[in-house]
């Protein structure tokens, strides 16, 4: 058996020491050995951390000589290292940081993967008390030069690209900051010599950075793809600014970006709105920077500094721990000024007190200290912008606050809404489209009895998810959704009363009697496209059913509500498809509720889940046309199966072409017809016939 190297023997002794010391209650580093490849590492010293001094030394491992661990101060050879000790509860957190950083390693632009590490050392961290060694931490440092790190931070201002023409992240496969991602050819952090290694296996499609692929009808495609001979005659000549993929990635959600702790942060100047005018989707600016409101990202996290886009309504719900809550409660909204045309706009702020804290705060069973100072937290913030042309004319903010104890514990649910209203709109209901519905707009509804009902609803659970604390949110057109809540039921619950209670809660979601066929139907005129809701017969709540007399069992409980909405495309306005509602049906489904007992059946409240779902079903506006004899016999000329489409040869001259005004299409068609007739008349047979006719006239 071969002999062990000094480094392996030292590592084994320290590891054995780290395992045995906690058993005796002695101080020990966790972990006792670290292989360091980044500029910073951390370890924890546990057990007897009072009056302990931490020192760092550099081990000179020579072949055949095992260095003896010593406890002492910093030596000259460790001036490149920094040791920070942070006390924790009964422990010490030790941070070892390399002062030079990765920039010193990547200074040589000609570095390659085959070069040795720029830092190769062995460090020993010692904990001592009164010159007596207590514990040791061995660190093997191997830091390699990062050839993918580039230093192009010459600009001091960030340029946010227009998302209408490209997504905010033009290289989706660039997942690592300041580092080269393999097979990601659009990653600007990759050096040319590194990119050559995987140039033949780059990621394709949108993930690889091809966020705006050329259309297959574009003339530039013929240079890169195999195209038929007639393609140059029928291809489309258009600049990239009119690509059919514009705006395809525009409506994206916010996603967080995590940066390493050693990354250099530069100060970026904000975008200069000299004219203070906005376009749809532009971030709203204040006199101090971007106007931000917490929003939920794609990963489900709550981003505290997410910009608000102009004319983009949203409703976000964030959940946070009250113990570490550092929210927006200290922000003075009255001092905020919105930049816009005509000068800054000062918001009008209204404060209200929350009535039921159980809807917002879920507290554990803990006893709070008596006499602690209270504090205010914002549980809801509602922002209503008034816009006119390309500017903001006003901002109304409603803040719902709650007063809680300073020692309050638990989870708090916060809600933030942003709504844009026209400057000329009053208290009337907002349209959901003109005339057809827009995707994501509320389904308009009314009650013939004059009740204040404007839409259909689903549940928005909060806290423990109980129905008593659940809020309501509108049903949005074109978005299938499922929601639910929990109803507390006792073991001795009366089944008839339970059915009536459940049915009443489900009816609250669909109090309306009619829904609007179009997005701009008039609320004051019932004949202006209002459809009566088709309601399936609800189950009889007072029926005497089997098992109804048994405690803890209730059959035929209407616990599920399904809403089906039939929609169709009813034409187009200026080339934009207009969608409308054909019918709305509500139907109940029953379940058998049974009290869930453990080892013993105690008289405690059980939870009955109630659910409500909405489904949008698209119905064709007209039956599809049967295939013609030409399509059946000549499948190679079928427009739906082949690139070549002879029936659409004159498509620009038909009424279906909406790329240009019809008058221009007619003028171009007549000009083309005139040129065609002139070409036919000037052909050789016609010229010869004219010459023959002239010769015959001369002889006569």
Curated annotation (Swiss-Prot):
tRNA processing among keywords: no
GO cellular component: ciliary transition zone; cytoplasm; cytoskeleton; membrane; MKS complex
Glycosylation sites: 76, 82, 146, 156, 389
Tissue specificity annotation: Significant expression is observed in brain, kidney and eye.
Disruption phenotype: Mice have ventricular septal defects and can display right-sided stomach. The embryos exhibit microphthalmia, cleft palate and polydactyly. Embryos lack also nodal cilia. Cilia in neural tubes are scarce and morphologically defective, and failed to elongate axonemes. Basal bodies dock to the plasma membrane in Tctn2 null neural epithelium. No Arl13b ciliary staining in defective Tctn2 embryos perineural mesenchyme suggesting that, as in Tctn1 null mutants, defective Tctn2 cilia lack Arl13b. Tctn1 and Tctn2 share a common function, with both affecting ciliogenesis in a tissue-specific manner.
Keyword Plastid attached: no
Positions on the Extracellular side per record topology: 26-665
Principal location class: membrane
Matches recorded under InterPro entries: Tectonic, Tectonic_dom
Subcellular location: Membrane; Cytoplasm, Cytoskeleton, Cilium basal body
Alphabetized UniProt keyword annotations: Cell projection, Cilium biogenesis/degradation, Cytoplasm, Cytoskeleton, Glycoprotein, Membrane, Signal, Transmembrane, Transmembrane helix
Residues spanning the membrane: 666-682
Secretion signal, residue range per the UniProt entry: 1-25
GO biological process terms on file: cilium assembly; protein localization to ciliary transition zone; smoothened signaling pathway
Membrane topology reported for the UniProt record: Single-pass type I membrane protein
Membership in a protein family: Belongs to the tectonic family.
Record note on quaternary structure: Part of the tectonic-like complex (also named B9 complex).
Name of the featured protein: Tectonic-2
Organism name: Mus musculus
